[in-house]
UniProtKB/Swiss-Prot annotation:
Description of how activity is regulated: Inhibited by the carbonyl reagents hydroxylamine and phenylhydrazine. Also inhibited by methionine and propargylglycine.
GO cellular component: cytoplasm
Protein name, UniProt field: O-acetyl-L-homoserine sulfhydrylase 1
Record PANTHER family: HOMOCYSTEINE/CYSTEINE SYNTHASE (PTHR43797), HOMOCYSTEINE_CYSTEINE SYNTHASE (PTHR43797:SF2)
Pathway: Amino-acid biosynthesis; L-methionine biosynthesis via de novo pathway; L-homocysteine from O-acetyl-L-homoserine: step 1/1
Subunit structure as annotated in this protein's UniProt entry: Homotetramer.
Length: 421
């Protein structure tokens, strides 16, 4: 089935008791076992089923199956936020003494999580240059490297990594490539797994949920990576919490997603609630329709901003002058997301003054809403970084970031024109 059909139907058939057409919300903590044997089998991972909603919930299960279908993956795991998803993904593969190789073209919160929080746990994150070439990742990789990390579109640098080349190099080295595909809109604009990525993460808060109403995240497992190569002892060695069970022997290429759920999610507890999952599912039903309008408005505004005398530059991969425009065509089929950045000629103060004049456009720290959003990254999302780190992440003092919504584009232009005056 095609994306537009999957976003409505994947992962759910009317449940037999009420025959509800809409996915029911299951606000329960726990589930009655059929027998002592049934309970024992569930806890021993001899069969799958519901035990406790920190690990699995029927409403959340529909979301996971639907997202996996949209991304072309084999399984998914929903989490309480996008940050929770990436933390869970990395700590499922890496432990103290291990390392991750990452692009520096990251959302500011991710950069801080990598540089500060993971370091405190003994996991080193090694950063490439902003060029994020495969040879840079290879040069930083050793026997303790557990993953390579990129964003499908860097936030807010708006670079597009060469996913095919990175995935090929990673697999030749036996390393899992993980792609934060939040800007890929749930797989509608881009499916990294199809280009060779092993895992995908999402902040479902953004375009998938799409209405600024709920915080949620997810990991999608492509089920296509050979974890047995010797690089992933956390997946191949006997599991002390399950009487020496070897996950790769029991679950094969799904060993990662099983461990993330029954070990990581069980112990760390970053579970998504059923109501939040249902809100994301409701947003997901119109994802393809919203995505088209988001991209159309963004491209229109990017061209318009280029013509404004107060604007020094405009950065959007859909513009012909963008250094990764060819990759936007290859990977995103000419629809590279709904975020653009631009610089004001007056620098830092001009950017803050512009933000203060906005009325229709919301000044807040989010992207992927139905409404258009604006922020000044240097003084907010990336303010915890040094000037050198900001520059490395693609942030400059004069930069404004726009997450373009679904409003009529002429109304957005009128708002921007007034704020620029």
């Amino acid at each position: 089935m095609r994306f537009e059909t999957l976003q409505l139907h994947a992962g759910y058939e009317p449940e037999p008791t009420t025959l509800s057409r809409q996915v029911p919300i299951y606000p329960t903590t726990s589930y009655v076992f059929k027998s002592p044997e049934h309970a024992a089998n569930l806890f021993a991972l001899k069969e799958f089923g519901n035990i406790y909603s920190r690990i699995m919930n029927p409403t959340v299960d529909v979301l996971e199956k639907r997202l996996a279908a949209l991304e072309g993956g084999k399984a998914a795991l929903a989490t309480a936020s996008g940050h929770a998803a990436q933390f869970l993904a990395l700590t499922t593969l890496a432990q103290a003494g291990d390392n991750i190789v990452s692009t520096p073209n990251l959302y500011g919160g991710t950069f801080n999580q990598f540089k500060v929080t993971l370091k405190r746990l003994g996991i080193e994150v090694r950063f490439t240059s902003r060029e994020e070439r495969p040879e840079e990742f290879l040069a930083l990789t050793d026997e303790k490297t557990r993953a390579w990390w990129v964003e499908s579109i860097g936030n807010p640098a708006l670079n597009i990594p060469d996913l095919e080349a990175l995935a090929q190099a990673a697999r030749e080295k036996g390393v899992a490539l993980i792609v934060d595909n939040t800007f890929g809109m749930g797989g509608y604009l881009l499916r990294p797994l199809a280009w060779g990525a092993a895992l995908v993460t999402h902040s479902l808060t953004k375009w998938v949920g799409g209405h600024g109403a709920v915080i949620a995240g997810a990991i999608v497992d492509g089920g296509n990576f050979p974890w047995e190569g010797g690089r992933y002892p956390l997946l191949t060695e006997p599991q002390p919490g399950y009487h020496g069970l070897r996950l790769t022997e029991a679950f094969g290429e799904l060993a990662f997603i099983v461990k993330a759920r029954v070990d990581g999610l069980r112990d760390q507890g970053q579970a998504l609630g059923p109501f939040e999952a249902w809100v994301v599912l409701l947003g997901m039903e119109t994802l393809s329709l919203r995505a088209e309008r988001h991209v159309e408005n963004t491209l229109h505004l990017a061209h318009w901003l280029l013509e404004q005398p107060q604007v020094a530059w405009v950065n959007y991969p859909g513009l012909p002058h963008h250094p990764h425009h060819d990759r936007a065509q290859k990977y995103f089929k000419g629809k590279p997301g709904a975020v653009l950045t631009f610089g004001l000629k007056g620098g830092y103060e001009a950017a803050k003054r512009f933000i203060s004049r906005l009325k229709l456009i919301s000044h807040l720290a989010n992207v992927g809403d139905t409404r258009t959003l604006a922020i000044h990254p240097a003084s907010t999302t990336h303010s915890q970084l040094s000037p050198e780190e900001q520059a490395q992440a693609g942030v400059s003092p004069e930069m404004v970031r726009l997450s373009v919504g679904l409003e009529h584009v002429e109304d957005l232009k009128a708002e921007l024109k007034e704020a620029l005056a």
